[in-house]
A protein has these predicted regions:
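A flexible loop/linker signature enriched in serine peptidases of the S9 family
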Residues: 184, 203-207
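Aromatic-lined ligand-binding clefts that engage carbohydrates, nucleic acids, or primary amines
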Residues: 96, 100-113, 139
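Bacterial Sec-dependent N-terminal signal peptides
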Residues: 1-22
Length: 207
């Protein structure tokens, strides 16, 4: 009996040795963008659905705003306060040195959307299961702040049980991978017209 308990304890210890939690300490920030709610005559829309604050997240805000932003905030701070509803963008990059599975945990804002490499994700109870390849991932969090509410920056962590080295940063630099070699748009051929006035360039795009 004691032997079984010792073996089980040793296994649990080994599992904990490989478990890693990466806390996102800094996020690139853009906003807040004040959003005025619609003038509501009826509480229901044409589909008999009641308007909710979450609908304000549908407001289109280009992600390039946060990519070009020079404002970096500590995740432990706030981004001020707005008299009206506002939408903000917070972003960071996840880098993994190998294939690994993990969980991205997000807390803070009540209403938010998560995009990874421009693709919208669907978290469940603030958690998102991810399978990372050895490359860089861009994570953008679009979140809503209610009127006169403190704009709390999202708290984000990534948990994995593997030996992978995963880092979170606001630096857009990335590794040069095989996808950079094979994927993308490249010049295939170039030819000059007989009179020398025109240049015909053929491009090839691979995915």
């Amino acid at each position: 009996m004691k032997r079984d308990i010792l073996i089980l304890s040793a296994l649990c210890t080994c599992c904990n040795l490989f478990a890693e939690e990466i806390t996102v300490k800094y996020l690139r920030y853009a906003g807040p963008y004040e959003i005025k709610g619609p003038f509501i005559v009826d509480s229901l829309d044409v589909n008999s659905k009641k308007f909710t604050d979450a609908e304000l997240l549908k407001t289109a805000i280009p992600f390039n705003n946060v990519r070009k932003s020079n404002r970096t905030l500590d995740a432990a701070t706030t981004a001020g306060q707005s008299k009206n509803s506002s939408v903000s963008l917070a972003s960071f990059y996840l880098n993994s040195d190998r294939y690994t599975d993990g969980t991205l945990q997000i807390s803070g804002p009540e209403h938010y959307e998560v995009y990874i490499d421009n693709e919208k994700q669907t978290p469940a109870n603030g958690e998102l299961k991810l399978t990372l390849e050895p490359r860089r991932y861009e994570v953008v969090i679009k979140y809503l702040t209610a009127p006169d509410e403190t704009n709390h920056i999202p708290k984000v962590t990534f948990k994995t049980d593997s030996k992978a080295v995963v880092t979170a940063t606001t630096d857009p630099e990335k590794r040069y991978t095989l996808s950079d070699v094979f994927d993308g748009t490249r010049i295939r051929s170039v030819s000059l017209s007989p009179n020398g006035k025109y240049l015909l360039t053929a491009y090839q795009t691979t995915y």
